[in-house]
Each structure stands twice: as C-alpha cells, then as structure tokens.
C-alpha cells in the first residue's frame, strides 16, 4: 500500500516542475541541470534526485505534466482555425501567441526537437505526438491526403514563425497571412492524375575556397545536426573533419566563432543559391505546382542533415548571442534579397510585402521541424496546398 504524500511534498513537486520549465526556456534542454533547477526552486538537489534519476527524466516529466496538454490545445486551435475554418478558433489569438510565445510554447519546441536524440524524452513525446496526429487524421495512412497536407502545412506555419523569430523577434502582422491560408484551404481542388515529383536537391556543403575550412564547417553541420550546438565539442568536430583541435583554434578564437561561421556559410549560401535557382517561380505558368515541387525537394533525404542543422541553430540562438546575431543578419539579408526579387524597391513596398517575405522564409523552416516530429512528411503531395494557396483569389 503506497504511503500518502504530504501536502508540502506535493507542493515541492509543483515548484520543481515550474522551475524546470523556466530553466528549459532560459537555457534550453541541452544545458538543463539539476543544480540550476533546484536553485531556482529554492530546494536541494536531493529533493530532485529523490524524484528523478537524471535530468532527462526531469525533462520528460516537464513535457508530460506541464507542456504536452497546453501545447496540443494550442495546436488544436490551429487546426480548427486554419484547416477547418472554424470561426470560434480565433486567428487573432493564434497570431498573438506567435508574436509573443508563452513559456510553454517555447519549451514545447525545445522538447519536441530534442526527443529525437534523448531516449527518455522520445519514449513519452513520440507516442503523444502520434496520438495527436491520429486524432486529427494527420497520420501517414489517412485517406484524405489533401487534409493531411493542409494540417502539416498549418503546423509548419506556426512552428516556423516561432522558430524564425528566435534570433530576434520583430513585430509582424501574421493574421492576414493565416487568413489567406485558411481561404485557400477552402477552395475547390481537383487532385492531379499524375504522380507528384519533387525537385532534385543535393546535400548542402561548404565552399569557401579552403579545403580544411570546408571540412570543419561541414563537420559542424553534421555534428550539430546529430547532437545539437551545445554538445558539438571541438574535438568531435575536428575528428570528423580528419583534423586536430588545433586546426580549429588556428582559424577561430573560440568554438562559438566556428559555429557561427558554419551557420553563416551554410545558411546564407543556401538561401542565396535557392533564390537564384527559384527566381523562375515568380513567372511560372503554374506557380503553385512549381513551388510544391521545390518544397518537395527541400524536404528530401539529401537535405535532411542541413534541415536539422538549421532547426538546431534556431533553437540554440535563444541561448547564444553571437549565434543569434549571425542568424538574424543572414535571415534579414535573405528577406531583403527576396523583396528585391519581387520588385519591391521603395521602403513603402518593402513594408507592404514584409510579412509575405517572412512567411515565405518561415514555412520551409517550419516544415523542416514538422519532418522531425511527424512520420512520412517527405511523401506528401504539396500541390494540394500550394496550388490553391498561390492561385489568384476569386473576387
């Protein structure tokens, strides 16, 4: 027979969970420590170890007791509003959460992303996500493939907007973009008779003119994609590049400087190359179909490590000022280039199209995040989303 726990013991349970949630938001899952949580809660580490064997078990408890239900309720509202067009699910409320995400939302993205590489988290997060996807008919075996594509896109939109703003938040009017998305989802759509073909896409590799530097940058990408930025040690990066740790410090004063350059080189290079390669989309006879093919290529297997690298970079930017500054600079430069490609030359035109440019950058980022947590995303026929979304709106 189990002993009844005292009221003070139960109150300490709550204090520790609240403290752990706050620590995850402040320092991230990778730097979550028992001593930091205990200090924040005003308790001893013994109080923590009496409840949780290790910090990963604590993170799993935060997901189950503090984050899961609240975040899934938010995602419920997203599907109701964007996919089902339910007027009771306020787009304005969703836009407010995206502009100023709650602690629970920030922690949810951290925990969802880390579950793929932390066993204790994976054991609770993966079944919970699968259950939610099944409940909303978003699993890989559903018959309504258009609805599944719409739901995955909706998830990518909200997660992408949040991730994109992590280096530096800026005021953006998101509600019109989501209203346009909802209207497009309600448009009639005839499923094409031909098979969806994703655009061919290769792996992203550094090309800075120095073989050793290229090797180091590519090694950062591979290691960070596997273990995250905080756990990407200099020795491991050097070993994968077939170099010594001294080769890193001969070129960079700190490991952080190397990580930031890797982000700048690989992300700026990819965004610039993609803009040049995809400029034809602005005048394509069927822009929706062409865009769907590009997105399919972006979500293909050769780009997977690079996609994970970018997601890890966005999350780490919340805790690393140098990385945040680099990411923000790269993203803003890409947005300016995109606006110029659209023909926006004046400051007024830039302001008018700013939300569109940010949405266009946030969507692929968000879909990369969806691909981390949902099965069979790469098999999605994205024409079901982009053909109606990019078609001229009926008057």
Regions found by a protein language model. Name each.
Residues 100-109, 117-142, 148-149, 303-304, ...:
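Amphipathic alpha-helical packing segments from all-alpha helical-bundle domains
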Residues 15, 23-61, 223-261:
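Helix-turn-helix
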Residues 72-105, 274-307:
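Hydrophobic alpha-helical connector segments
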Residues 19-23, 97, 219-223, 363:
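Short amphipathic alpha-helical elements of helix-turn-helix/winged-helix folds
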Residues 5-12, 204-215:
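Short, Lys/Arg-enriched anionic-surface-contact patches
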Residues 122, 140-204, 324, 328, ...:
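Hydrophobic/aromatic-rich alpha-helical bundle segments in the mid-to-C-terminal region
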Residues 12-20, 37, 62-66, 70, ...:
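Generic hydrophobic, amphipathic alpha-helix propensity
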Residues 18, 114, 145, 218-226, ...:
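Long compositionally biased, domain-poor regions of proteins
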């Amino acid at each position: 027979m189990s002993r009844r726990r005292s009221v003070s013991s139960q109150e300490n349970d709550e204090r520790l969970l609240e403290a752990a949630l706050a620590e995850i938001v402040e320092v991230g899952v990778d730097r979550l420590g028992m001593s930091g949580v205990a200090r924040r809660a005003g308790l001893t580490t013994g109080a923590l170890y009496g409840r949780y064997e290790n910090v990963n078990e604590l993170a799993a408890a935060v997901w189950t007791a503090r984050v899961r239900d609240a975040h899934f309720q938010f995602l419920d509202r997203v599907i109701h509003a964007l996919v089902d067009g339910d007027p009771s699910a306020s787009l304005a409320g969703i836009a407010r959460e995206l502009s100023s995400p709650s602690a629970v939302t920030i922690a949810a993205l951290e925990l969802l992303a880390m579950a793929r590489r932390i066993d204790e988290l994976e054991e609770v997060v993966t079944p919970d996500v699968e259950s939610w996807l099944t409940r909303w008919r978003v699993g890989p075996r559903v018959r309504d493939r258009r609805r599944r594509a719409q739901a995955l896109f909706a998830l990518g939109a909200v997660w992408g907007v949040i991730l994109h703003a992590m280096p530096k938040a800026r005021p953006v009017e998101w509600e019109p973009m989501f209203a346009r998305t909802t209207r497009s989802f309600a448009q009639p759509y005839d499923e094409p008779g031909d098979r969806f073909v994703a655009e061919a896409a290769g792996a992203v590799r550094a090309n800075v003119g120095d073989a050793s530097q290229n090797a180091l940058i590519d090694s950062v990408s591979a290691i960070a994609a596997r273990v995250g930025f905080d756990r990407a040690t200099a020795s491991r990066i050097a070993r994968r590049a077939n170099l010594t740790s001294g080769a890193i410090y001969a070129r960079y004063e700190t490991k952080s400087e190397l990580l930031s350059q890797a982000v700048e080189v690989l992300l700026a290079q990819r965004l610039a190359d993609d803009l040049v390669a995809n400029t034809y989309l602005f005048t394509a006879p069927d822009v929706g179909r062409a865009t769907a093919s590009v997105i399919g290529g972006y979500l293909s297997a050769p780009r997977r490590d690079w996609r994970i690298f970018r997601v890890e970079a966005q999350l780490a930017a919340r805790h690393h000022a140098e990385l945040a500054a680099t990411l923000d600079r790269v993203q803003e430069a890409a947005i300016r280039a995109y606006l110029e490609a659209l023909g926006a030359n004046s400051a007024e035109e830039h302001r008018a199209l700013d939300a569109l440019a940010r949405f266009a950058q946030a969507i692929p980022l968000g879909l990369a995040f969806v691909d981390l947590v949902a099965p069979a995303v790469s098999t999605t026929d994205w024409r079901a989303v982009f053909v109606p979304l990019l078609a001229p709106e009926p008057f």
